Structures are given as C-alpha cells and as structure tokens.
C-alpha cells in the first residue's frame, strides 16, 4: 500500500525498481579474503549505520562463517577480498548484497589483527580480542 503511494508520488515505473522485504535481525558486514589455500572470514556486527558504519564490533560467528564457506564460496570463486552484507535472524542468514571491494569497516579488521596486505599474506587469522569501533563525525562551520 505504501509502496504504491511512493511509486505514484515519484512517478516511477515498477519495472525499474528493486524492492526487498524488511528483515528484522542483526546486521553484519563480513570481510572475506580468499585464495587457493585459505579463506579468512571476519564477521563485523553493525550496531549503527548512516550510509557508513558508525558503531560496530568484530565477532566470531560460526553460523555466518559456515554459511559463507558452504554457500557463497562454493559459487563465487574469486581470489581476493570482498564484502558480504547480511542480516542474521536467529540461525537464518539473509544476504543483502555482495560487494567486490573492501568495506568501510576495513580499518576495524586491520586493528583486530588481520592485515591482508602485510607480509604474512593469508596467515591463519586468530581473533586475539574483541574490538569495537565507534566513528565520530565532526562538523566545522566557517
């Protein structure tokens, strides 16, 4: 009902739209780094987002890691870094998008102990400590 009002108000054509259902759950942005030998999967729980992630925490999450390994990496055979955005509702994973790039949470990944560009390329990643990020935005007026 609301979508039809939106379409009419903005004079849009339904065939030009991609509409997703709202899924209530926990949002994650997942860093994935892969080559022929290793897969590094680092879930980042997103608490606050406004275009970019503002508040997030690196978490170990076997449900997400297993889903990426058994579903996504079976069909997506890239050999580099990419980002998966998803919603986790209980044990069910809903993929929102897959991006062939680093996410805005990449600095958090490096700070948590994994740098894909270091000399220890694709060493086994061990999460040493849970680390949180809160992005502070400042405005200057002149």
Pin down the residues of each PLM region:
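Peripheral (often C-terminal) accessory segments that flank ATP-dependent C-N-forming ligase machineries
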Residues: 89, 119-142
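Residues within well-ordered alpha helices
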Residues: 71-72, 108, 120
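Glycine-centered helix-boundary capping/hinge motifs
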Residues: 76-77, 113, 125-126
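Phosphate-binding site of ATP-dependent enzymes
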Residues: 2-76, 87-88, 92-94
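Conserved metal-phosphate-binding beta-hairpin within the catalytic cores
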Residues: 75-108
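Glycine-rich phosphate/pyrophosphate-binding beta-alpha loops
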Residues: 47-58, 99-112
